[in-house]
């Protein structure tokens, strides 16, 4: 989970929990912006969700691409 570790080391944060009406989502933000927002899939473990979040953060770092499943972007 090197990308999550790097984000937190740089002052960012991650959050896992409900975002009404979504039962479970994982979000990541740096000190300025949301860099990823993922919706937990049916049957997806928290471990798998965290791995997807780590990959999404990596895509932000490499390609400046924000993955936002919460808002449909």
Region spans (language model):
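Short acidic DE-rich linear segments
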Residues: 69-73
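N-terminal acidic leader/helix
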Residues: 1-27
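Amphipathic alpha-helical packing elements
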Residues: 24-68
């Amino acid at each position: 989970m090197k990308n999550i570790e790097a984000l937190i080391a740089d002052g960012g944060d991650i959050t896992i929990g409900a975002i009404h009406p979504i039962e479970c989502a994982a979000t990541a933000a740096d000190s300025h912006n949301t860099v990823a927002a993922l919706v937990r899939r049916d049957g997806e473990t928290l471990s798998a969700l965290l791995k997807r979040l780590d990959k999404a953060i990596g895509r932000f770092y490499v390609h400046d691409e924000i993955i936002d499943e919460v808002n449909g972007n």
